[in-house]
Each structure stands twice: as C-alpha cells, then as structure tokens.
Amino acid sequence: MSFALALLLQTAPAATPPAAAEPCDKPVYMVVQGRTLDRARMMAYGKALAQSEIYQRLGGYYITLPQPVAVFEGDVPPDYVNLTVRFPCLANARAFWNSRVYQETILPLRQNPPAGDYTVTVYAEAPLRADMAGRVEAGRFLADFSQAGEPQVEPKP
C-alpha cells in the first residue's frame, strides 16, 4: 500500500451507519374535504388510486365514506365530500403523498383543470381516554408497513 493511500485511509472519516428507522406506530388521519366539480374524473382518479395498491403497501385504509349519513348543524352542499384515510404513521402518509405513482400518475387525473376544490390535511390520533380502556380496541396496526421501497418525488415547499 502506498504511503499516500495509507495516510488517506487514516484521515478519512469513518462511514456513519444508517439511522435506525423510526417505529411506524403513531397512527395519523389524512382528511380530504371539499367540493367535487367533476364526478366522472374523480371516479377515474379513485379507480387509479385503488389499482395502484399504494394504500395497501403503506397501510392506509378508508375509515369513512365521503358523504355524511346525517347533518346536525350547517348546510352541506350535495357535492361536498369528507374522506378520511388512516395510516400507521406520518412517515407513511408522507410516503403516500410524495410517492412517484401518486404525484406523477394519479394526482394529475384530478388537476388541470381541477376536478374538485379540496384541502388535504393530516391529524394525529388522539390517545385513548382511560375510561375507554377495555371498552374499545386501541386500533393499533398488527403488521409493519414500510415506506422505504416506495419511489418518491421531491416534496413541494
């Protein structure tokens, strides 16, 4: 081994081990709400979303249907939807949103011009109240859903 190579190896920083993945065990809820402007295009969007199986890969699933079963206060337009998707953690919700398949193939189906006027927000799951322990299931995920293999796009600022 040459002297220069030996010197370089002595002064080179040691490779840092990859960071351990955060546990994906704090469920979040992605809420999509707003008015549907083009139902046919939204149906095509929903079909593409289902066919991609991205929710299945990331542990996402619907916990509500988009239309209310009752309105207790206020006026809800007939084209208004509120759809909630549960993910096992924020990282998986982000992996869904920033996935190449969603951003480049599925999302454009409802944009330009917009097929709906929606907001998409994510909320943490509230802790189970002590008085509810033993009365309801905690709703935890029993399988791991890794976001590591899902191709991503750069998140928008």
What are these regions (language model features)?
Residues N82-D131:
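Surface-exposed, polar helix/loop patches in the mature regions of secreted/periplasmic/lumenal proteins
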Residues M1-Q10:
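Bacterial N-terminal signal peptides
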Residues A4, R41-A44, V101, T105:
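Exposed alpha-helical structural elements
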Residues L9-V81, P88-N92, Y123-P157:
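Short S/T/G/P-rich N-terminal loop/turn motif that feeds into the first structured element of a domain
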Residues S2, D25, P113-A115:
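A generic structural signal for short, non-catalytic loop/turn and secondary-structure boundary residues
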